[in-house]
A protein has these predicted regions:
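BZIP DNA-binding basic region
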Residues: 1-22
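Conserved phosphate/metal-binding and DNA-contacting active-site motifs used
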Residues: 22-170
């Protein structure tokens, strides 16, 4: 049985490799922004959500910069289940649910991604493994849900996105 080292940065070689690969994939523009936090899975109203946390484990907010940190600090922290990015400062995100099936991008998702008018910064597979995040250059404005039979959300501020660093190759 492996013993967890409470002050270790990584608990296994696989964890170290994932962190290194994520750092290589996440664009420098996002890594340099002090808009990072941790998140944990939590139940709310019978639904699993991703609750934002500070690197110390306190509640964080997607609208309170005092609860955000650097990419390096968020990546080093072992609090919760992963890292998240607070949208804003010209960085927005399209969140496409159920866009992947067995690792294959659905035709509707590919068509939508190819039609995105804003410059794309970074594309990744979401935490569920079935969704897609498309980080974009965007001016701040209200979020919106694009239905068209699919669940597509676009946010530019006031939200955070759980970041996996698992690059989506189109």
């Amino acid at each position: 049985m492996a013993i967890r080292r409470p002050h270790a940065r990584f608990y296994s070689p696989a964890c170290r490799v994932r962190a290194h690969r994520a750092a290589e994939v996440i664009p420098e523009r996002m890594r340099k922004a002090d808009r990072w936090m941790r998140w944990t899975l939590a139940e709310r109203n019978g639904k699993t959500t991703k609750r934002p946390l500070t690197v110390e484990g306190r509640s964080a907010s997607s609208t309170d910069p005092a609860t955000w940190t650097t990419y390096a600090a968020a990546s080093r922290s072992t609090v919760g289940n992963g890292i998240g990015f607070a949208l804003g400062e010209g960085i927005g995100c399209y969140d496409l649910d159920d866009a992947l099936s067995d690792g294959t991008l659905a035709d509707w998702a590919r068509e939508f991604i190819e039609s995105i008018p804003e410059p794309v910064i970074f594309s990744e597979v979401s935490q569920s493994g079935n969704g897609v995040h498309i980080f974009i250059e965007a001016t701040e404005g209200p979020g919106r849900v694009i239905r068209d039979g699919r669940k597509i959300e676009r946010y530019t501020a006031g939200r955070y996105i759980a970041v996996t660093g698992v690059r989506l190759t189109l």
